[in-house]
Swiss-Prot record:
Name of the protein in question: NADH-quinone oxidoreductase subunit D
Catalyzed reactions: a quinone + NADH + 5 H(+)(in) = a quinol + NAD(+) + 4 H(+)(out)
Disulfide feature: none
Ranges in coiled-coil conformation: none
Amino acid sequence: MSGGMQNGTQETERRVIDINDRHTVNVGPQHPATHGVLRLIMELEGETVTRADPHIGLLHRGTEKLIEYKSYLQAVPYFDRLDYVSPMCCEHAFALATERLLGVKVPERAQWIRVLFAEITRILNHLLNAVHLALDIGAQSPSLWGYEEREKLLTFHEAVSGARFHANYFRPGGVSKDMPTGLAEQIWEWSEKFPKFLDDLQSLLNENRIFRQRLVDIGVISAEDALAMGFSGPNLRASGIAWDLRRAQPYDKYDEVDFDIPVGRHGDSFDRYLVRIREMAESLKIIRQALKAMPEGPIKVQDHKITPPKRAEMKRSMEALIHHFKLYTEGYHVPAGTTYTAVEAPKGEFGVYLVADGSNRPYRCKIRATGFSHLQAMNLMSKGHLLADAIAVLGSIDIVFGEVDR
């Protein structure tokens, strides 16, 4: 046998052995570490990941199509069920998009209330992600602390909307109802105690040897790759890009508040965790500024073709009663036009491309889910790491499948 043929045979044998050494594992969709219904098909050499292939769609409900058959007001609750960890921020994008097409200006108080609850929602989201990331890699205590703190914030949600999660609170034209008496004082009192909790959480995790070993230099993504993959939010900022829509394209009252944009340097899982921790402190600053700056006044536009009249007014005025009936049976007609409106949701850029045809229903509502872009980088970030590290990477990018699958 010639040398060339012999080398070729050896190469073929080596390739066969390499392929046979690999095995395929299904992670999920019914697994607590996948944070929902993700199915990850992972190709492993021993315990080292050579390929991670996310399979999505198991929570697809046809949200975008369903919205086309609802009035603009009836469409709002669908947004609560997208990123159900931070529902008010999803409502925010749709409300802003509809208002832009309607050409209405929301009252000052309503804008400040939106900013206030958008930041409370951001803390709810980041807190859940931080303690669940710790839980994914074996630390149980932080999750117990975190849930206790989240319960206080969910009480504020419930006070304004009547619901802990599916708030249906941000409406086109303002918010559904005003903050109850005493709630602002309760939020202020909570804001004075929260920094101590945040310090305690960091003292438990930041310098913990096992926590750092599981996250530092794991799932690194460069700034160039993050931009190419369409990253946004904390995942992009952890790679060193200081991009935040609240600063770059301010909406509501974000141009009147002072806050810093935390940025990472290494783009690894630990930086993604740290950016979210720092963002909670910045959100707290915004909450306190919003409480100080919030004026008295109406909480929705005074056009009763868009927002309902007060109950007392309906008992006195037939016109108000007709407005109420028309609003909740037919809805309002939005002038023909298109808009893309995005907000800085806790997970990144959550956008709504809204097409109106002059009727009382959206002609098209395309939703830009933040997690969709982040999930496609799982293969890039997991390759070469151990299987257990891939779970840590997944936890660090903060995925919710309500919005990914829609």
